[in-house]
Amino acid sequence: MSSRTIMAFDFGTKSIGSAIGQEITGTASPLKAFKAQDGTPNWDDIEKQIKEWNPDLIVVGLPTDLHGKELDTITPRAKKFANRLHGRFGKQVELHDERLSTAEARADLFEFGGYKALSKGNIDCQSAVVILESWFENQWG
């Protein structure tokens, strides 16, 4: 098992959550939520985080419906965000199914902090944690 550092993003048109994890432990921690204008973040802020953590790989959540079918409105935008991450920073980027990640993130946050923990930024970052930990589980089969 390698010890790569993996960063994850939960793409949204208004907010993009992020998380960081270690492949060797299969666990992730929330980082920060980036405000976005119609899906476009402040790339300087993203760059600072990528330089600080220097991930070996970036995982971006791929929005789909409950059957795994891509959504016409948001899925292409998440793919574009992933392509831009690769193009701007030269990092390997993988897409990962994010079905039900927001619901799971809300449940996790509520369990530990009640309603006060359910801010938009917290939910987006916890969703990135769920996406990354799901990606780890898929790697181990």
From Swiss-Prot:
One record GO biological process: rRNA 5'-end processing
GO cellular component: cytosol
UniProt-listed InterPro entries: RNaseH-like_sf (IPR012337), YqgF (IPR005227), YqgF/RNaseH-like_dom (IPR006641), YqgF/RNaseH-like_dom_sf (IPR037027)
Protein's cellular compartments: Cytoplasm
EC code(s) of this entry: 3.1.-.-
Function: Could be a nuclease involved in processing of the 5'-end of pre-16S rRNA.
Coiled coil, from the record: none
Predominant cellular place of this UniProt entry's protein: cytoplasm
Superkingdom classification of source: Bacteria
GO molecular function, one term: nuclease activity
CDD domains, per database record: YqgF (cd16964)
Pfam families referenced in this protein's UniProt entry, alphabetically: RuvX (PF03652)
Keywords: Cytoplasm, Hydrolase, Nuclease, Ribosome biogenesis
Protein name: Putative pre-16S rRNA nuclease
Organism: Aliivibrio fischeri (strain ATCC 700601 / ES114) (Vibrio fischeri)
Record-stated family: Belongs to the YqgF nuclease family.
